[in-house]
Regions:
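Partner-binding and oligomerization surfaces adjacent to conserved cores of proteins
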Residues: 1-318
Length: 318
């Protein structure tokens, strides 16, 4: 069933609410867009049970966001740069042959790249402090939906680049487990790596390993996009020339239209009013210059109000 067929079946029902009253055109249009987005994801990305309209947020730096807006490229970092020792994998798995000689498999892990989001519903002090420097106060939070992220990825890499069996990418919620379970998963992966006949299974198995995280991090409510970079070599039109925009550390950049998936941008709540005003102004200029205005969309750019409170007056009967 095509995306159009999947959404056409429900067009009539979208014009009424549960009680049968007609809905306004604006409400119907918004509702219809959400349903179309859900139908597209279910048709083209049947690898996750997460509702495509689930809001997700990404914490990054102002510099990375501005580079993404200007280059129209989404940056995925090497998984070897992740701080948790159970995530970088090559630092945790030591392979030996039967004579206890070390086997170097780091070249396999270096081709994997990832990006982390969260399903946390509100501003999170935990994530602002964990993902953004307290000293530099240069953090930003991007709001989107799971479906928009997946759709931008599929369009960015060219959906024809993905095989029917998804052994080249993952985009889903992270599974949190005890340390012992994570270690067992890596042992299974190590067995595949040291047996050449199993190499065809290494990529999907490593992707699966990169979708688990220790229970200690469960408060992050993480969603991950993980890619095997080797699978996309030979598809240069889908990727941005790294010589034009340099990210640090080096990663994988795929072409993306920011207007397709960014719904809101919040800047660091730890900035003073004056500092925040300058950052918001610069980002708003980028937003206007790189696409939103031309497609008739607006995106909210503001400072996070995590540390702001409304004035409260308490009257005492003395």
């Amino acid at each position: 069933m095509s995306v159009d067929d999947a959404t056409a079946e429900s067009d009539e029902s979208l014009c009424q609410d549960a009680s049968g009253f007609a809905l306004s055109e604006q409400v119907v249009e918004a509702y219809s867009d959400a349903e179309k987005n859900k139908a597209f994801i279910r048709e083209n990305w049947p690898y996750s049970d997460l509702d495509p309209n689930t809001e997700i947020r990404r914490f990054t730096t102002v510099e990375h966001l501005r580079k993404m807006l200007r280059s129209k490229a989404n940056y995925l970092a090497s998984v070897l740069t992740w701080p948790d020792v159970y995530e970088g994998l090559s630092r945790s798995i030591k392979l030996e042959d039967q004579y206890h000689r070390a086997i170097d498999w780091s070249n396999i892990a270096t081709s994997f790249y990832g990006q982390c989001w969260t399903t946390a519903e509100f501003d999170s002090e935990l994530l602002w402090n964990a993902r953004c420097s307290r000293e530099k106060k240069n953090g930003v939070c991007i709001r989107s939906t799971f479906g928009k992220l997946v759709k931008s990825f599929l369009r960015g890499v060219g959906m024809e680049a993905l095989p029917k069996k998804n052994g080249v990418a993952r985009c889903d919620t992270v599974t949190y487990c005890e340390d012992a379970v994570a270690i067992e998963k890596m042992k299974e992966l190590a067995y595949l790596i040291q047996n050449p006949d199993n190499l065809v299974l290494v990529s999907p198995s490593l992707l699966d390993c990169l979708m688990i995280k220790r229970m200690s991090y469960s408060d992050e409510k993480e969603v991950r996009l993980i890619v095997d970079g080797c699978a996309f070599r030979g598809n240069p039109p889908h990727f941005v020339d790294p010589r034009k925009f340099t990210f640090s550390p080096p990663g994988l950049n795929y072409a993306v239209e920011p207007t397709d998936f960014i719904d809101e941008i919040l800047v660091d709540p730890r900035l003073s009013d004056g500092e925040a005003s300058k950052v918001v102004g610069a980002l708003q200029n980028d937003v206007n210059a790189y696409g939103w205005r031309s497609v008739g969309r607006s995106v909210r750019v503001a400072q996070s109000d995590l540390y702001r409170s409304s004035a409260v007056t308490v009257t005492l009967n003395i």
